[in-house]
Design a protein with these regions (language model features):
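Extended, low-polarity segments enriched in aliphatic/aromatic residues
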Residues: 1-196
Length: 196
């Protein structure tokens, strides 16, 4: 990640935002320390142009961005997400090569599965959205046993309850239609097997 950021800064990027949905309350750099990412070290090699954003909620923004899926989508017609994902000129998917039970091999496309925030799509939600939610999206996007707490009903009802092998690949297509990736960089040296 740091090497890629250094290259992007060298080639003129004014700012490089590393964002991910992390299971920590902190929304900024403190969330990334749990995984060993030190913003100061990144900024030393990137001329101060790096920033870290935990996108598990709306974060510092007043509201969520609603991003439509072109063509209506396979299972979702739109996504409500942290605005970091839309206030960008270039979207780079930076991930580890992983194998998944339901998504096959995680490449650049499956890596976008973390975009929908826990605050609207998370398993630890009870009856309403919560900016404090930290949990994964198993019930909404794997098993499809409940809908997310978005401002409108964007899931079209074509999912198969309990069938993550059907649901996950189709949500991956919908996410990639809504958030086209400009560049994919995969770490295929440190791989993860059977992540889920």
């Amino acid at each position: 990640g740091m090497a890629l950021g250094s290259l992007l800064a060298d080639y003129g990027a004014r700012r490089v935002t590393y964002c991910d949905q992390l299971p920590f309350k902190a929304i900024g750099e403190a969330a990334f320390l749990g995984y060993g990412f030190d913003l100061q070290r990144f900024n030393e090699v990137m001329a101060g142009r790096a920033r870290f954003v935990n996108t598990r909620s709306r974060g510092a923004f007043a509201d969520y961005a609603t991003v439509k899926v072109p063509g209506g989508g396979e299972l979702a017609s739109a996504w409500e997400v942290n605005r970091t994902y839309v206030e960008t000129d270039v979207l780079v998917s930076l991930g580890k090569l992983k194998s998944h039970v339901s998504g096959g091999i995680t490449g650049g496309m499956k890596n976008l599965f973390g975009i929908p925030p826990s605050s609207l799509y998370g398993d630890d939600l009870k009856q309403e959205p919560s900016e404090d939610a930290l949990d994964y999206r198993g019930a909404t996007m794997h098993a499809c046993t409940r809908k997310p707490f978005t401002s409108a009903d964007y899931f079209n009802g074509k999912s198969v309850e309990g069938d993550h092998g059907f649901n996950v690949p189709r949500f991956i297509v919908d996410l990639n239609s809504a958030f086209p990736i400009h560049l994919v960089v995969l770490d295929a040296i440190s791989v993860i097997q059977t992540a889920e």
